[in-house]
């Protein structure tokens, strides 16, 4: 076959396959059999392999998955992906309607209602009609680049019907039938199954190997247009029509409503129809349709005033409580958990539900053998709502919390002003295991590849009993464990070695000192600079530090007044674990060349690791100026959790937005 003929045939096959994809995955109206589709795809793949000079990034063949990635790159959203306020009942919806009408002086308002797809929010960027990048929502400010995985989703067009530059946003999801099939395959292979379709979709999209995502049969509904060049669209409903014309899959079940009564009727209708859909929904999104009215209403500190998400009530089911088991946390708290006859709740099989503490068991009069009502709090965490007393037979057994720890047999105590029972034995194996899991976690030593499963394996094999034991692990020991090969063992040993270089605040937080969170750990690290200096500090010295109270000061002094802890610190030294603060102190910032010099910065939302007052001091010490509002003169917005109206202002004025992680990286350069 000549090059000219091959090129022509490749173009024909691409057009044909794009048409097939659109008919099947967007219109839900397939025109060819799977076998015919596969034959055309295989022919295209073969021709492109033989003629690589004709390969194109938007070829349908890229949907089978490409090169395995090493890591997902971070992406800062051009405009933040904000969350919505919630409504839980008819009264909340009427309050929303009242606020909207007050905000626009009772002008005529039309709402658009859409199904709230329970999947993974993503953004899609197109340049002159070509798909160039896709990213997860992340924290709303910064997400992860998942372009290669999104290319495997056939409902996402790789080339639009117009050469337009835009950003669309939507929800990637896994159809119920695909979820059932995937879990059946996992069970047959002896693998852990996914809890629900949402987790399955999120887990599939975040695979470093796009070929895995390609096999998972994901789909996507686009629900909004974040921005589009050289085009003004007056309403949200028209923007959805426009997206459909471009080739996107939009949900066909949307409806415009002239009154709040029509909105409520739509909500009730889909609450009934919900089980019959082939995808999960967890509510209804209601928006003011007119874009000009949206801009007039603006946003609050947390969410837009022109939209709200109605959350369906948590599904409640009845099952039998067959027993109560106990778990011991890293701080020694003993928590009771209900063992249940397996029952499906909100799309997943539930076998256990939290009972929180002994007082709750007494308050609800929960007994072993009772029939109980179970729901998922926030559609996530199973909990026992109440007992069905009418079903009692008299054979149910009252439950009494033990007097001794289920893990080590030490006597349990209830500390003053606490409802929880605690094991205060420092050598309790359950506490040690949970403490190890905390030590390696993301905000602590952040050891990649060391999660709960591996820690449990190492603990059960008696390879680790203290934090310091992690630093004596060898590749040979890891190779003795299930699911470890040469590469994974080598990578984990290297990750543990890398963690030795962490700054002091990570080590302090990882130790799990009572009352000391990530923010306090950073405060101590910056103030004392070395572990030795902190160990020698008195309670009075600690209390002089801003935001350190008596309880925390006493806890820190008591922690270090322990021979076992001092021995642990000595072992850290011998293994070469860094115990000094590597961050920048405010006093040292005056002479540092900094990005922040001459910049105007706005801080918004809750900063987890560094408080806003501390962040303000550091920015000012680096020559920056911190203001309380966003304007055209603002250079940067640093956004923590629950950031709201200032993000919208940043978008309006085209101001760069960083999350806390990006901010800390710049500070520590």
Curated annotation (Swiss-Prot):
Location of the active site: 116
Residue intervals of the BRCT domain: 591-669
Cystine bridges: none
Organism: Bacillus cereus (strain ZK / E33L)
Positions with a binding annotation for Zn(2+): 405, 408, 423, 428
Function per UniProt: DNA ligase that catalyzes the formation of phosphodiester linkages between 5'-phosphoryl and 3'-hydroxyl groups in double-stranded DNA using NAD as a coenzyme and as the energy source for the reaction. It is essential for DNA replication and repair of damaged DNA.
The keyword Ligase is assigned to this record: yes
Signal peptide range: none
GO biological process terms on file: DNA repair; DNA replication
GO CC annotations on file: cytosol
Keyword Iron-sulfur (UniProt): no
InterPro entries in the record: BRCT_dom, BRCT_dom_sf, DisA/LigA_HHH, DNA_ligase, DNA_ligase_AS, DNA_ligase_CS, DNAligase_adenylation, DNAligase_N
Protein name from the UniProt record: DNA ligase
Origin organism lineage: Bacteria, Bacillati, Bacillota, Bacilli, Bacillales
């Amino acid at each position: 076959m000549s090059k000219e003929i091959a090129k022509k045939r490749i173009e024909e096959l691409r057009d044909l396959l794009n048409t097939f994809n659109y008919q099947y995955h967007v219109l839900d109206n397939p025109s060819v059999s799977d076998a015919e589709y596969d034959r055309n795809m295989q022919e295209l793949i073969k021709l492109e392999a033989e003629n690589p000079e004709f390969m194109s990034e938007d070829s349908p063949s890229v949907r089978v998955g490409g090169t395995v990635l090493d890591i997902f790159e971070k992406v800062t959203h051009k405009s933040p992906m904000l969350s919505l306020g919630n409504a839980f009942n008819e009264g909340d919806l009427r309050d929303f309607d009242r606020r909207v009408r007050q905000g626009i002086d009772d002008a005529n308002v039309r709402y658009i209602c859409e199904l709230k797809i329970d999947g993974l929010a993503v953004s899609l960027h197109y340049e002159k009609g070509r798909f160039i990048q896709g990213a997860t929502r992340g924290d709303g400010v910064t997400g992860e680049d998942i372009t290669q995985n999104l290319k495997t989703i056939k409902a996402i067009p790789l080339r639009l019907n117009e050469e337009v530059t835009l950003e669309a946003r939507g929800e990637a999801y896994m159809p119920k039938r695909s979820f059932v099939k995937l879990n059946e395959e996992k069970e047959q292979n002896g693998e852990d199954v996914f809890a629900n379709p949402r987790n399955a979709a999120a887990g599939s999209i975040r695979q470093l190997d796009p070929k895995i995502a390609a096999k998972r049969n994901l789909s996507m509904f686009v629900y909004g247009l974040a921005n589009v060049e050289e085009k003004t669209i007056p309403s949200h409903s028209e923007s959805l029509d426009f997206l459909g014309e471009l080739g996107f899959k939009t949900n066909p079940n949307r409806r415009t409503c002239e009154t709040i009564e029509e909105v409520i009727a739509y909500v009730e209708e889909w609450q009934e129809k919900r089980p019959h859909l082939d995808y999960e929904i967890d509510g209804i999104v209601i928006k003011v349709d007119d874009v000009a009215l949206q801009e007039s209403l603006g946003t609050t500190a947390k969410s837009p005033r022109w939209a709200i998400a109605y959350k369906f009530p948590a599904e409640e089911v009845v099952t039998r409580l067959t027993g109560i088991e106990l778990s011991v946390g890293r701080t020694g708290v003993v928590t009771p958990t209900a063992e249940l006859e397996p029952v499906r709740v909100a799309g997943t099989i539930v076998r256990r539900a939290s009972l929180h503490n002994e007082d709750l068991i007494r308050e609800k009069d929960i007994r072993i053998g009772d029939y109980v009502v179970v729901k998922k709090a926030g559609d996530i965490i199973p909990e026992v709502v109440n007992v069905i007393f009418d079903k009692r037979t008299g054979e149910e057994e009252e439950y009494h919390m033990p007097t001794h720890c289920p893990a080590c047999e030490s006597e349990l105590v209830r500390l003053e002003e606490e409802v929880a029972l605690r094991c205060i034995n420092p050598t309790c194996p359950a506490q040690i295991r949970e403490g190890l899991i905390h030590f390696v976690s993301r905000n602590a030593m952040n050891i990649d590849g060391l999660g709960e499963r591996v820690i449990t394996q190492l603990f059960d094999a008696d390879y680790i009993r203290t934090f310091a034991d992690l630093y004596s692990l060898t590749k040979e020991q890891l190779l003795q464990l299930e699911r470890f090969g040469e590469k994974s063992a080598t990578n984990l040993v290297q990750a543990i070695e890398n963690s030795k270089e962490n700054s002091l605040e990570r080590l302090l937080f990882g130790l799990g000192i009572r009352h000391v969170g990530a923010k306090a750990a950073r405060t101590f690290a910056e103030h004392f600079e070395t572990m030795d200096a902190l160990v020698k500090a008195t309670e009075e010295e600690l209390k002089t530090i801003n935001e350190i109270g008596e309880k925390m000061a006493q806890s820190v002094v008591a922690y270090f007044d322990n021979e076992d802890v001092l021995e642990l610190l000595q072992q850290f030294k011998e293994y070469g674990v860094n115990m000094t603060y590597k961050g920048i102190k405010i006093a040292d910032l005056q002479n540092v060349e900094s990005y922040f010099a001459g910049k105007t910065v706005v801080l918004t939302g809750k900063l987890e690791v560094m408080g806003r007052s501390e962040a303000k001091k550091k920015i000012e010490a680096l020559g920056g100026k911190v203001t309380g509002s966003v304007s055209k003169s603002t250079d940067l917005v640093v956004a923590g959790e629950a950031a709201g109206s200032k993000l919208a202002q940043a978008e309006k004025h085209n101001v760069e937005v960083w999350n806390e992680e990006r901010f800390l990286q710049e500070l520590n350069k």
